[in-house]
Amino acid sequence: MAFYYQKLFVKLILKGFKKVYFLLKIKFDTIQHLNKLKKSNSYFHTFLNKESLAVGVLFLRPGEKDTQEPHESDEIYYILNGNGFLHINKKSYPVKKDQIYFVARNIPHHFYGNTKNLSALYFFGGSDS
């Protein structure tokens, strides 16, 4: 069973420009979540949904349509496997394993053109609403 650990160092600038650092550790089993997703009728699953952070997995089969709408929060995609393109605000970017993409809030975007199964982790800078 493969576990991915995401360690995020968060830096806060408080009043008076004092710096505070803390470590946020999230443990999740992406294989388990992807296997559940493959058996469902959906192509994405949010497994952590907090007020300030949402994390989930996206899985698209070759040719499957990505119908997502712009989100109210900034989003980061980490490509786990596959290929294709990510269309962000009228520009397309080729995607491949281990690449990271940032999409600002309220910006139209979608994946397309994958000839292999495409799986990605996504992180919202807020809840997945």
Kindly give the residue locations of the regions a language model identified:
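Conserved short histidine dyad/triad with adjacent acidic residue
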Residues: G56-H71
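Short, conserved beta-strand element in jelly-roll/cupin
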Residues: H71-F85
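Conserved GNAT-family N-acetyltransferase fold
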Residues: L58, Y77, Y101
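Short, surface-exposed secondary-structure edge patches
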Residues: T67, I76, K90-Y93
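Well-ordered beta-strand scaffold positions
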Residues: E51-L53, L58, N83, K91
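Ligand-binding loop in jelly-roll beta-barrel domains
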Residues: R105-S129
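A short, N-terminal "cap"/entry segment at the start of jelly-roll beta-barrel domains
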Residues: M1-L53, T67
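Short acidic-glycine-tyrosine-enriched beta hairpin
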Residues: K91-R105
